[in-house]
Amino acid sequence: SILLQSGLFGLGPPCSIAINFEDAETRKQASVKRESGQTELVPLFHGQDTVAGEVRIEPLPGKKIEHTGVKIELIGQIELFFDRGNFYDFTSLVRELDIPGEISQRKIYPFEFQNVEMQYESYNGVNVRLRYILRVTVSRNYSSNIVKEKDFWVRNILKEPEINNTIKMEVGIEDCLHIEFEYNKSKYHLKDVVIGKIYFLLVRIKIKHMELEIRRRESTGSGPNTYNESETLAKYEVMDGAPVR
């Protein structure tokens, strides 16, 4: 297949393909960090949303495209970075846009995927990526298929849990340091505030400062092929120096 991009020596695709969402101007966008380190804004959807818009195919001047059909797919897939090139598709929906024929001038195809079941949230991790894409394929008999992809982001909003217990834990070093901490609840939303208390029950060592970190833990694979990663998302200094009464 030819993935649409600028071709060298005239070997590029004979047309341009654009995938546009019908509510692109009003729909919220998510900021996504790519492997290159650059940040990109992509349309944000929620589970059970309708994904609709149009596909524009425009042949290059003087070109015409003979094809055996045009289709658009909505795909949800998981890619493990230690198994690159292999994708697990957990959602795959198809809409046929055109029957076999010829495209000699710009054609616009509307598409709609109603109330799509998108139960998993998009995720870009250290070792795994879960993504949703729209993929347009112009199938051809004697030449490579022409393929265009467009990413979108899925974030699901859950109801606030009826039961949200506090967290209490005790940690320390035997006969040297004994602390107890408490958080006001065990489940938080993305814009929540973490409120808690830390009690120093025993201090027999010198303390320079105390920090609170928010970490994201990621576990991929299974059994002996399990990969664990931890990433610090935020760090706060909550105490400078030793605790005093």
Q: What residue ranges belong to the model's regions?
A:
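C-terminal beta-sandwich interaction modules and adjacent acidic
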Residues: 1-245
